[in-house]
Amino acid sequence: MKVRASVRKICENCRLIKRRGTVMVICSNNPKHKQRQG
C-alpha cells in the first residue's frame, strides 16, 4: 500500500474508490498498485 498525496490509476485494471472519505486505488491485476491518499 503506497500512501501518496495524489493517487492515479497505474494500469487499466486499477479502480478508484472512496472508503470513509479516503480516496483509494485497488487493483485486481497487480496488488503493487494499491494506493491510499493521505
Curated annotation (Swiss-Prot):
Belongs to the bacterial ribosomal protein bL36 family. NCBIfam families: rpmJ_bact (TIGR01022). One of its GO terms (molecular function) is structural constituent of ribosome. The keyword Plastid applies. GO terms for biological process: translation. It comes from the Eukaryota. Coiled coil: none annotated. PANTHER family: 50S RIBOSOMAL PROTEIN L36, CHLOROPLASTIC, LARGE RIBOSOMAL SUBUNIT PROTEIN BL36C. This is Large ribosomal subunit protein bL36c. Keywords: Chloroplast, Plastid, Ribonucleoprotein, Ribosomal protein. It is found in: Plastid, Chloroplast. Its main location: plastid. One of its GO terms (cellular component) is ribosome.
